[in-house]
Amino acid sequence: METKYGIIFYKETSNIGDDIQTYASKQFLPHIDYIIERENLDTFVSKNKEKVKVIMNGWYFHHAENWPPTPFIDPKLISMHFTDNIKIQGWSASYPNVFDNFGKKFFEDNEPVGCRDVHTQKLMDSLNIKNYFSSCLTTTLSLPGKAEKEDVIYVVDVSDEVVEYIKSHTHSKVEKLTHYLTHEDQNKSFDERMKCVEELLTKYRNAKMVVTRRLHAALPCLALNTPVLLIKYDDPNYKGRLDTFYDFVNNVSESDLLNETISVDFDK
């Protein structure tokens, strides 16, 4: 029987970063037989009830009641991010299937878990689940063709103050981009969404520089050899998800940039 492959897709997302992660897994698949909704993993059934191989990178438990995935999914657990807010907020009593009972058994049956960040590793360690640091799959991204570099700095979902600061400190064109998806974007087909991702990544590849708050703008830039500056969030809720990558990507807080506590040469 021919091996069947599925891909994780989050149709209702408002962040194209989720689509970028899907695009990253797509490059490793010989073909796609099933598009599997990330938040409905517990209801997926393959056509002939065969096992479907799925790369399960991404951020899970937005709808914790839908965990674990069905037995029709043969998972490759890599580049996964989990938050323990479910336990912190006392939800584990309502959703015991996440980190206990058959939820934990899913991890045990499919370990080791490739963790996107150290925070997730520590969570897996606390559950005695075998794991390793895999980083994010978006650091493996590649695009067809060659880069055609342009004298443009893309600023992605940063504050107006940061945009104006950069404009006053460079001779290059500064252009704003966003990772927010509109309802119109959400209604596009899978293939259309992947085309939008490729167009965005091509812009990043061709840029002189990218300045962003978005992890899935910064990490693809590393893969595409584009200089990138990550503006750090002051919100501690982002710490576990982002701080693992501060050793890999140039980063600065907004206040340090605007106050010039740390100097950045945008014309280098």
Name these PLM-found stretches.
Residues 1-268:
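Active-site anion-handling motifs in enzyme catalytic cores
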